[in-house]
Amino acid sequence: MAQVDFIETTLGELVGAAQAYKAKGWRFAQCCASRNGDDAFELLYSFVDDATNEVANLRVCVTSADEIPSVGGIYPVAFMFENEIHDLYGLTVVDMNLDYRGGFYHLHIPAPMAQAPQGKAKPVAAAKPAAAAE
């Protein structure tokens, strides 16, 4: 069974950690964000060693005021994930190798995932069967 690690890190350590994984031959698998409070977000960067199937997840906690350094200079494919984080969460990623400047997704609401939930969802009424033909 593959080992999966979750490692707490900081914005200041993020680029150096990505460089270390690149130097060891690990691939960048993904980066995602989640809203973790009123102005708190969690970023998760995943790296994989294909030889051993080991996975390392770097966890970084940020606020909307933070500037997130891009790892795109190390792993060029990161531009997709970083643009997604910017567009969906409104977070600032600096020094992206390909910056869509908010146009990666065409959204009706700016940064929809950064918005606080608007209350409990209302249940959808069950569909009523159509009346039988006479």
Language model features: what each stretch is:
Residues 1-134:
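Terminal low-complexity/charged segments
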